[in-house]
Every structure is written in structure tokens, then in C-alpha cells.
Amino acid sequence: MVDLEAAVEAVHRAESAVAQHDWFRAWGPVLTALFIAERGFLAGEDAAWISEIRNQLTVLRLRALECYAATELGIAGTELAGAVRAGQQLIQLAPLRESGYRYLMNALAAQDNLAEALAIYSQLCDTLREQLGVSPSPATRELYQQLLAAT
């Protein structure tokens, strides 16, 4: 439980730093949170309290991946590949959570892979339409329009 508490504290510090665009201050705490959240918890065991801890770790991992993607985008340069990986992981873990798609689209566009970024938007549209019958949020549509304008 100590690790979970440390990870919660670390992701909170990382989120605060990201909100202030202090990418280098976010770096250490976000890595701590990711390392803890990705470890898993009592593999092979099954109890209600274990499931609750696993759910908390999953939510924590999503928050940490979002912070990591934002931090990598903020640092830019050679760190953009990390933002791409984080966006891909977010999409895999939570395919209906649009933030992962936006991080991935931004990272790909920053790497001059604009067509690939636009294809990610199309993938999101298909997923949302098939699963929920809805369109992307205004924030995601706005990012798509910005990327289109850059072509």
C-alpha cells in the first residue's frame, strides 16, 4: 500500500507541474508513478480488495501516461517518441478516452507525420461511431481542424 500512496503523490506532483508547463519538474514524479502503476498487483490472486487496488492502479496508470505524454511533448525534440508511445498505450488501455488520441496526434504532427496524425483522428471517429454512435469532442475536432490547416 505504501507504493500506491507514493504513486498517488507522485502523479499529483506531476500533474501540478504539467499544469504549470514545468516539464522538467514533472519528469521524475511521472516516471515514479508509471513504474509503480505498471508493476501490477498480486498476480494470480483474486479478491474484492485486490480488484479495488488493481482498479486504482489502472486509473493511476492512465493519469501518469497522460502526464508523461504531456511532459514529452513539452520537452519535444528527441522526447517526442516517448509521447507517441504514451499516446499509443493510452489508446490501447482506454480506447474511448480521447486524450490518448489527442496526445498521439500532437506527437505525430510534431514529428512531421501529419498524415499519420490525421489517420489517428479517423481511427477515433470510427471507434466512437461503432461503440457509442457519437462524434469526437469539440477539443478533439478543433485539434483535427488545426492539423488539416497545416497541410
Ranges and model annotations:
Residues M1-T151:
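Intrinsically disordered, charged and Pro/Gly-enriched terminal/linker segments
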